[in-house]
A protein has these predicted regions:
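Conserved alpha/beta-hydrolase "acid-adjacent" motif
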Residues: 154-164
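Alpha/beta-hydrolase-fold enzymes
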Residues: 23-114
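Short, proline-enriched alpha-helix->beta-strand connector loops that line the catalytic pocket
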Residues: 139-145
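Short beta-strand/loop motif that positions the catalytic acidic residue
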Residues: 147-149
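Glycine-rich nucleophile elbow surrounding the catalytic serine of serine-hydrolase chemistry
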Residues: 13-23
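Catalytic histidine neighborhood in serine/cysteine hydrolases
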Residues: 167-172
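Active-site nucleophile elbow and catalytic-triad environment of alpha/beta-hydrolase enzymes
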Residues: 114-136
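Alpha/beta-hydrolase fold nucleophile elbow
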Residues: 4-15
Length: 172
């Protein structure tokens, strides 16, 4: 804004980026002119259970380790859309097997790399902060927000999570 004061400042957040964008606008929303959220979600399934397990691992000194059970608790629900055998671990992300294969074999794609227990706890804390009417109350009322998702997007809970977020904003 300092370098280009006459240009509008937009944020586009997709999937996990939409969570970060929501967290950002709750604090700095007056600094942006518009937000587009693509594939965001409302109430995150199994959040409390995942947070508890992450905190237990951290308390045991295992914060920098990775427990696949944490990923299963927090993200396993996204695989419900998968009707075929799970080969790569990213099948939830797209119904096109070629896209799934290419992403799984892309050395720059980090979606399949292990995440530490501490990172998952930070993720859970962010999700907790952007969930519900208390989050929506922090977002500037006049900030235009475009909220979109596909009806086959598991992160957006097949459109239902996006509707929840929209409702929180409308109610605030």
């Amino acid at each position: 804004k300092e370098k280009y004061p006459n240009l509008p400042y937009f944020i586009l957040g997709h999937s996990m980026g939409s969570f970060i964008a929501r967290d950002y606008v709750a604090t700095y929303g007056s600094e942006v002119d518009c937000v587009a959220l693509c594939g965001t979600t409302g109430i995150f399934p199994n959040l409390a259970e995942g947070m508890k397990l992450c905190q237990e691992h951290i308390d045991e000194g295992k914060g920098d380790e990775s427990d696949p059970n944490v990923a299963q608790i927090l993200l396993g629900w996204m695989f419900q859309r998968c009707t075929e055998e799970i080969k790569y671990g990213n099948e939830w992300s797209c119904s096109d097997p070629i896209v799934v294969y290419n992403a799984a074999n892309d050395p720059l794609c980090s979606i399949l790399r292990p995440t530490t227990n501490r990172s998952y706890l930070y993720f859970c804390q962010m999700i907790e902060a952007i969930t519900g009417p208390s989050w929506a109350e922090k977002v500037p009322k006049k900030l235009p927000i475009y909220n979109v998702a596909g009806d086959e997007d598991p992160v957006g809970q097949y459109g239902e999570g996006v509707k929840q977020v929209t409702q929180w904003l409308e109610d605030s």
